[in-house]
Structure formats: C-alpha cells, structure tokens
Amino acid sequence: MKTNSSFHAAGEVATQPAWGTGEQAAQPLNGSTSRFAMSESSLADLLQKAASQYPNRAAYKFIDYDTDPAGFTETVTWWQVHRRAMIVAEELWIYASSGDRVAILAPQGLEYIIAFMGVLQAGLIAVPLPVPQFGIHDERISSALRDSAPSIILTTSSVIDEVTTYAPHACAAQGQSAPIVVAVDALDLSSSRALDPTRFERPSTAYLQYTSGSTRAPAGVVLSHKNVITNCVQLMSDYIGDSEKVPSTPVSWLPFYHDMGLMLGIILPMINQDTAVLMSPMAFLQRPARWMQLLAKHRAQISSAPNFGFELAVRRTSDDDMAGLDLGHVRTIVTGAERVNVATLRRFTERFAPFNLSETAIRPSYGLAEATVYVATAGPGRAPKSVCFDYQQLSVGQAKRTENGSEGANLVSYGAPRASTVRIVDPETRMENPAGTVGEIWVQGDNVGLGYWRNPQQTEATFRARLVTPSPGTSEGPWLRTGDLGVIFEGELFITGRIKELLVVDGANHYPEDIEATIQEITGGRVVAIAVPDDRTEKLVTIIELMKRGRTDEEEKNRLRTVKREVASAISRSHRLRVADVVMVAPGSIPVTTSGKVRRSASVERYLHHEFSRLDAMA
C-alpha cells in the first residue's frame, strides 16, 4: 500500500461510540493525579479523538528500505488511520461475532497498524503475531494460532498465499475451522462511503499479547483497554517526570507483535497524538546505523532497543554514518526485554557521546507482557547506575557489594518502583523478603493483565497470588508472580535472573546471565550458558556465536583455541566454575525468542541432540 499524505477529507468528525451489549464495557480511568491522565476508556476512543483533533497531522511514517536502500517514506495522517481502520472494522463484521479473535500476520508496515486499529475499532480481540517463516518460530506461531483460535486473519497481499497455506495446518490440531484470511491492502481503503463508528461494541479486552516464551510455550496474556491506557500513563510519567514536554516522534524498529514494539510504535503515538517514525527489524539488522540516523534526522525524543540492539549499533555505526548528525535532543532510549549489560551501556554512551547523546537518555527498564509491558525504571535525568555484587553471596540469595569488581556481578539498577507496587517474595513461603535478600518479584497495579487466555489454572497460579502475613500497608493480594528474581538494595530494584533459568552446577545456584556477561566481555556476540545432565550431576556448557576472522584455516583454528582458553579461564576466575564444553557456532545458530532472548531449554535440546554445527570441531 503506497499512501499519499495529501489524501484527506475535510469536515468529518467522529461521534462518541455507543457501548455494545457483548462484554462488559471498559470503564473510564478515574482518580489519576498524573498530568497524563485521560478520560477515554478505550484505545478506539483515543484514535477517534486523535483523528478529530489533529486530522491532518502525520500519525505514522514508515521508512521502507526494501523499496529504496536510502529509505522510501510512507505516511498516514490521524484522519487516514481512523478512516481506514473503520473500513477494516466493517469488513471484519461481515464474518465476525462478538468476542472473536482476529490474528494479524503481516510484514512490518503501515498495513499492520491499520489492521490492528481496525480490530480495535470493530470491538474484537486483536492477536498481533509475526508472519510465519517456516523456520525456528514456526511452532511458536502455530501454538499461538491454536490457542487463540482466530476466526479471521488479517494480512497483506505480499504474503497472503503463504498465510493462507499455513493457517489451516496451524489450526487443524484443535479441530477448529480454518480462519478467513483478509488482505488489508486489497480493501478499498480510500472509499468515501459513510461510516458509522457507533455501530461497534466496546468490550473490555483489547488484545492478546503472546509472551516471548523463553522458558515455556508462548501464552496469551489478556490485556484490557484499561490495562494498556494505564500502562501508557505510567510509562510517560516515569520517563518524562515533571517536564511539560511530552516526548514527540518516537523512533522504533521493534516488531509490532512484541509488547514494547506495539506500545512504542503504535499505541504511545496515538495517546500523544503525535508522529511515529518506524522501520522494520530487518532494516535495522541489515544496517544498524539506520536507527541512529533516524533518531538524529527526525529529532526523536524516545526510542527503545534490547541489549543486542545497542551492541549492533556500537559495532556497526561508523563516524561517516553519523557525519553532521546530532543526538542532543534524544531524551529517552529504553532498554529492556533481555537483561541489561552494564558494559554494553558504557560502550554505547561512549560511542555516541561525540554526537551529543547524553548518558542520562539511557533508561534501563523492567517490565513483562503480564504487566502490559512496563513496571519500573530509574527517575529521569540520571545516568544508568550499577552495583557490583559478590557472586558467591548472590548464589545463596544475598546481595552484598564486592570490593573487587572483577569478582562480582555488575547489575544495573531499575530505580525505586513508582508506577506499580512491587514486592520481593520468597517463592516457597510466599512471605516478603527483607531488603538485600533475593526473591521473586511480585507486581500489583491496574497495568497487570487479566490472565492467560483459556488457561484458568495458570491464571490462578500467576495472576492471583496471595502473600502470607503481608507487612503493614501491603495488601494480601492478588499479586502477579513474574517468575523473575530480584532484590531491593539501597531502595532500588535489581534483577538477578529467572527462577526457571537458574543453573544448578555441582549443587550450587548460578545465574546464567552473569556467566554470559563474563563471556561477552571476551567475544562480544550472542552467547548462552546452559546446564546439561551427566551421570552424577549437571555440567556447565557455553555456546558462543562467533564470526570467522582468520584468513586461513590454521589462523582460524588458533583463534578458536585462544577463545576457548580465555573463556574457560575467565569463568573459572570469576565464577569458580569449570566449563565442561565450550561450543562455538556461527551467528544465528542460538535459538532465540521473537524479542531476541536466548531460549535456554531449546539450546539444551539442540546440544543434547548434537544439532549445533560446531566451528570448533576442527580446532
């Protein structure tokens, strides 16, 4: 779909929608003291408001690097987004019934946004997903389709054949009928026919956010309009503080089917009624410098990336790429999704300091799909803070500073949680831990989702937890059990790892992220630390992605041997562990989630079945 930013129709003002009779209508958000508070009770209402107040303002600019390596800009205004979403909504109701799910399987682009907004306008439940690639994510997408059982799939003409072939097989296991597949760009989105926004329902549920599933199969988190709007308000308040300037022009390459990509790229611009500049994840991976260039050229104020995105930007952005560009206006770059590496943040700020990027713009943030996306970050105007904790003390659940930085776990602070209520809890006794003691992070607030789709047992266990003997001023429940391990140290939150990902080697607990951080100081690329069983206990195995650099086979063999020795020595020195096997593989070999997190359980299976193609086999 090639959009034309000059295409507008004057004089059309949407009317206030009537509540439907299906699900309970979403209630307005009341009682907030934030300057970002809003009375709109659904995302559909917010889109209608943006279209009414700023019809001619650019809403989304998508930079298409496939059409033109220099970047071809496609633009839609708020009026266009609302109008096209209404046309999609009318099409959906030809086939849909109240409460139906509508999956979105489309390439990153404006059509994805129109599809998502169309589902919300129709009062149906959106299920944002990636396009199936018949690769490592096949079963995960199939699992989400079987679980959500959509009646309709929205896609685009460029991939409709692939999606139409794929969908029946993905849904067949449940015995459900194949969903109807609709190409959004094949609809008459420029139609001038009269549209009635009051005909559609306003149910409480907005969409299902399927988790990235680093430790289990993806699960659909049920998120209400209230959850999403609340979290937007929390996020903006914490990132912007008391500033009168709301962040304009988000720049994002994060996939729309990921929680932060959806929030930053689609929803937050709608709430701010401003313009988002977007590109595809593939465009970023092909040339990471594009991200920094867009931040500078569009005077962006807010963006986001996981840890690996920062690494790629550092390694693959040259001074020539940044010639004449300035990043002084960038106020917030959120980093999360995977554990934040302190060394990565240091390299990033040092690399782009000559282009006026302030270190206070880097905002390590904690969140999860079960809490919509965002839970905590340090206050604005502060550079990232880290503390070096003693490895051995952490392994027994105590957070104590180490005097020797080389012998400790350097963890980044996520500040004192303000948006949500957070407690550190012993997962066995369900009692609150004192400050300085590691435990499971429990979260409470209106941003916490309603549960897992069609999984009441797991919903009860995860979203309905109750504290035993809560401290004064702390409610008994319900609480969200995050599955993340953390500690409150000197009044601030630090994340130590995942409960299910703790490595037990020789009877002692070890955080895999700490071991991986040690290795990355040597290798710089993606790495995964896993524990695999042997005859008596579990042994430590590390899998490291490396690019070939030796000019000859002999040079490459010597390099691989050197890396093996350095990795084994560093882990022994820092963690007092012996590595049973150091596996070196080509980039892209380690299985990851859709958000870039390493999948440890899948890595264990591949290792045990000898499925890694080892570069070190010849060394």
Swiss-Prot record:
**What name appears for this protein in its UniProt entry?**
4-hydroxyphenylalkanoate adenylyltransferase
Can you cite an annotated GO cellular component? plasma membrane
Entry keyword annotation includes Ligase: yes
The protein's annotated pathway: Lipid metabolism; fatty acid biosynthesis
Output the PANTHER family linked to this UniProt entry.
DISCO-INTERACTING PROTEIN 2 (PTHR22754:SF32), DISCO-INTERACTING PROTEIN 2 DIP2 -RELATED (PTHR22754)
**Gene3D superfamilies according to UniProt:** 3.30.300.30, N-terminal domain of ligase-like
| Entry keyword annotation includes Protein biosynthesis | no
For this protein, what is any one GO molecular function term? ATP binding
Q: What is its EC number?
A: 6.2.1.51
One family name in Pfam for this protein: AMP-binding
Output the superkingdom of the source species.
Bacteria
What chemistry does it catalyse, as a reaction equation? 17-(4-hydroxyphenyl)heptadecanoate + holo-[(phenol)carboxyphthiodiolenone synthase] + ATP = 17-(4-hydroxyphenyl)heptadecanoyl-[(phenol)carboxyphthiodiolenone synthase] + AMP + diphosphate; 19-(4-hydroxyphenyl)nonadecanoate + holo-[(phenol)carboxyphthiodiolenone synthase] + ATP = 19-(4-hydroxyphenyl)nonadecanoyl-[(phenol)carboxyphthiodiolenone synthase] + AMP + diphosphate
- Biological processes per GO annotation: Actinobacterium-type cell wall biogenesis; fatty acid biosynthetic process; lipid biosynthetic process
Provide this UniProt record's keywords sorted from A to Z: ATP-binding, Fatty acid metabolism, Ligase, Lipid metabolism, Nucleotide-binding
Q: What does this protein do?
A: Catalyzes the activation of long-chain fatty acids as acyl-adenylates (acyl-AMP), which are then transferred to the multifunctional polyketide synthase PpsA for further chain extension. Involved in the biosynthesis of phenolphthiocerol, which is an important intermediate in the biosynthesis of phenolic glycolipid (PGL), also called mycosid B.
